[in-house]
């Protein structure tokens, strides 16, 4: 079974979540978007160290966050990120970059129309 197949139900659960539903419709607040991006950045602070430089999202997430309200730190993201330290992060990288490459391409145009920054979903290397 592929990782995609194994996580398909989780993806659908995210889309059915209240915040996920608002995000997909572009109805997320700037504060919610900041909090979401902060959690992504927390995870990328661990994952990006194991990836080629062109895959790094930390600087792009920092740029996106710089124009948003101050994010509220997520204990869940901090705990999950700490659990990744010292372990193979291939699976986490797959999920994070899949979210940016697939979901981000769908949601970025919607969120950008609302003035919410989405530079973290732009990849210089289209094969990344």
For the regions a protein language model found, what residue spans apply to each?
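Metal- and O2-centered redox machinery and metal/ROS homeostasis
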Residues: 1-128
């Amino acid at each position: 079974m592929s990782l995609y197949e194994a996580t398909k139900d989780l993806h659908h659960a995210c889309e059915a979540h209240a915040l996920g539903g608002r995000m997909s419709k572009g109805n997320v607040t700037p504060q919610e978007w900041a909090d979401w991006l902060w959690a992504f950045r927390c995870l990328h602070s661990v994952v990006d160290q194991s990836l080629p430089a062109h895959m790094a999202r930390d600087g792009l997430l920092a740029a996106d966050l710089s124009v948003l309200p101050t994010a509220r730190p997520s204990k869940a993201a901090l705990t999950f990120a700490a659990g990744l330290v010292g372990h193979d992060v291939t699976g986490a990288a797959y999920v994070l970059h899949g979210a940016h490459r697939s979901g981000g391409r769908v949601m970025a145009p919607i969120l950008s129309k609302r003035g919410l920054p989405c530079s973290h979903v732009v990849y210089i290397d289209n094969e990344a």
